[in-house]
């Protein structure tokens, strides 16, 4: 009974995928012109976002480089206008991304270089803008500085370790001033290097962290099309839905979140590991002997790819732990190649687990931070996130109790709903791992669904967490239902999610900026209605079927 349910569940998930034609017809001249205009429309949006961030972004409390500069300081004096600019720019970029979808999912598609140019064009304006949508980067600076001073960032927070009057602590939100670091030692080790390089210069440190984000995005862009090719998905389709997703520009590039590095290392590691597992030659060449020639070294290439992939995935978990799920699906793919037996399962899990523990031990020892991160994984649970269904249910139940006069039991219900959510995550992930082990599900698809379930049932969900699932699934899932749902979620969260720096604005300012942005976008649509592909492109007229030439004796029997 259980086996049949597993087969049915894994089969229903497997139906999200269907092979696509990797090569499609190129765009015609009219479509290329329309695509370029659309790309420019989106780039204009990111420029507006960057300008608006001078007033509406998450600027530092001290060492603000725009302070006192006549032109650059103007947006901070008209914050509602600045918020309108960032909101309008984000909507323009999201709509341009949506319009580009017809040139990546249709019968004629953009080339890889055209999509890469779009990605770079939309990224550049945000690289020099102040942080947006989050102040987490200032927590990164403070926690790294604590480590530089020789203190343990997993025991003390910025207020205790640096003092309330420190330049980094002043820019950290009050909620996080007393909390220890919830990030892995690799990320804090990188932060230590940045702090040692830049000292207490906030602007230089922020730009260095944005450079780290850019490296992570580069790894994402490198790995996603290769994983898509491995799964039988068109490269430009996967790149458009994943790395070109508006949430990546808004929250990873503009928001400077370490998810970029986590996802980049995880996806690159998954690609290398699967490259070794899917190789035609054996993983372990026989007989086992030290290679003495180039040909013999090449026989070890599949094993080298597998080990390199496992190391990269383990490194990604030392930025944020959820990416370690990828190693589980790689282990199941390896066990399936070895026959899917219990022995193969044990050997693959043991060997890859040993590599992972070795990498963690080396990073913990080299950084001097050890394994203290294991005790701060629940730090973010202090946030009550409405995007998390378990948390939302608890908050709603607590409010019902208050209305009925039963008291506020939100905290108690939170403990129950979050525990149930974690239990459901463990069941879902175990189910998916077994499906990959039996060969019913591709490991990339299993990883994407597992991360999607983790985000959905996680105690705390932030808008950028959605990219954990969207990017790997973009390389595997092709069904219109999945892509349509992903597009809808992206637009809803991207447009109606958090403002550029929501804690600084009143409800009146947010409402006014939203209305002004809506009017501005509608005017832009009206002005560009005939120049941009707002309407579906008409299908080319069908050619009438050619009549076959009559045979010589076609009318032989006619009177």
Swiss-Prot record:
InterPro entries given in the database record: MptA/B-like (IPR049829)
Bias (Pro residues) ranges: 535-548
Membrane topology, record value: Multi-pass membrane protein
Disruption outcome: Cells lacking this gene still synthesize lipomannan (LM) and lipoarabinomannan (LAM).
Localization in the cell: Membrane
UniProt-listed Enzyme Commission number(s): 2.4.1.-
UniProt-recorded name of the protein: Probable alpha-(1->6)-mannopyranosyltransferase MSMEG_3120/MSMEI_3041
Primary enzyme class: transferase
Source taxonomy: Bacteria, Bacillati, Actinomycetota, Actinomycetes, Mycobacteriales
Main location: membrane
NCBIfam families: MptB (NF038066)
Keyword Disulfide bond in record: no
Source species: Mycolicibacterium smegmatis (strain ATCC 700084 / mc(2)155)
Function: Catalyzes the addition of alpha-(1->6)-mannose residue.
Entry's transmembrane regions: 41-61, 81-101, 202-222, 247-267, 300-316, 321-340, 355-375, 386-406, 419-439, 455-475, 480-500, 507-527
A GO molecular function held by the record: glycosyltransferase activity
């Amino acid at each position: 009974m259980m086996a049949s349910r597993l087969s049915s569940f894994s089969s229903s998930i497997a139906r999200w995928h269907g092979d696509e034609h990797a090569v499609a017809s190129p765009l015609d001249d009219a479509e290329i012109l329309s695509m370029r205009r659309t790309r420019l429309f989106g780039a204009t949006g990111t420029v507006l976002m960057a300008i608006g961030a001078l007033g509406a972004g998450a600027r530092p409390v001290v060492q603000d480089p725009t302070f006192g500069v006549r032109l650059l300081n103007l947006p901070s004096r008209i914050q509602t206008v600045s918020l309108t600019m960032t909101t309008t720019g984000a909507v323009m970029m999201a709509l341009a991304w949506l319009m580009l979808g017809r040139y990546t999912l249709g019968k004629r598609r953009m080339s890889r270089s055209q999509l890469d140019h779009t990605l770079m064009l939309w990224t550049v304006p945000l690289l020099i803008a102040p942080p947006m949508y989050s102040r987490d980067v200032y927590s990164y600076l403070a926690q790294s500085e604590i480590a530089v001073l020789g203190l343990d960032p997993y025991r003390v927070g910025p207020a205790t370790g640096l003092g309330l009057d420190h330049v980094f602590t002043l820019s950290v939100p009050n909620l996080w001033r007393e909390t220890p670091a919830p990030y892995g030692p690799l990320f804090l080790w990188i932060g230590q290097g940045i702090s040692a390089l830049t000292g207490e210069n906030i602007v230089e440190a922020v730009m260095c962290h944005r450079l780290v984000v850019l490296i992570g995005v580069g790894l994402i862009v490198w790995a996603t099309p290769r994983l898509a090719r491995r799964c039988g998905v068109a490269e430009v389709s996967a790149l458009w839905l994943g790395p070109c997703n508006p949430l990546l520009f808004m929250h990873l590039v503009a928001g400077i979140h370490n998810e970029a590095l986590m996802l980049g290392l995880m996806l690159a590691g998954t690609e290398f590991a699967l490259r070794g597992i899917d190789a035609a030659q054996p993983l372990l060449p026989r007989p086992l002997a030290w290679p003495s020639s180039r040909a013999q070294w090449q026989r070890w290439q599949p094993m080298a790819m597998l080990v390199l992939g496992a190391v990269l995935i383990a490194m990604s978990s030392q930025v944020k732990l959820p990416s370690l799920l990828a190693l589980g699906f790689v282990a199941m793919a390896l066990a399936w190649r070895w026959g899917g037996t219990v022995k193969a399962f044990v050997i693959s899990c043991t060997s890859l687990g040993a590599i992972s523990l070795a990498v963690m031990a080396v990073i913990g020892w080299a950084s001097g931070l050890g394994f203290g991160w294991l005790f701060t994984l629940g730090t973010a649970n202090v946030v009550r996130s409405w995007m998390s269904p378990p948390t939302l249910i608890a908050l709603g139940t607590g409010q019902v109790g208050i209305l009925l006069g039963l008291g506020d039991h939100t905290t108690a219900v939170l403990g129950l709903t979050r525990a149930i959510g974690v239990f459901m995550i463990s069941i879902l992930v175990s189910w998916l791992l077994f499906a990959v082990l039996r060969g019913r599900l591709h490991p990339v698809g299993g990883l994407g669904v597992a991360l999607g379930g983790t985000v959905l049932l996680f105690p705390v969900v932030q808008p950028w967490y959605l990219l954990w699932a969207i990017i790997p699934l973009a390389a595997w899932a092709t069904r219109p239902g999945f892509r349509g749902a992903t597009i809808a979620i992206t637009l809803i969260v991207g447009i109606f999610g958090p403002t550029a720096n929501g804690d600084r604005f009143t409800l009146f300012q947010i409402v006014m900026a939203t209305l002004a942005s809506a009017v501005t976008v509608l005017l832009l649509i009206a002005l560009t209605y005939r120049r941009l592909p707002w309407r579906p492109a008409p299908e080319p007229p069908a050619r009438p079927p050619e009549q076959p030439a009559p045979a010589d004796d076609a009318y032989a029997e006619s009177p």
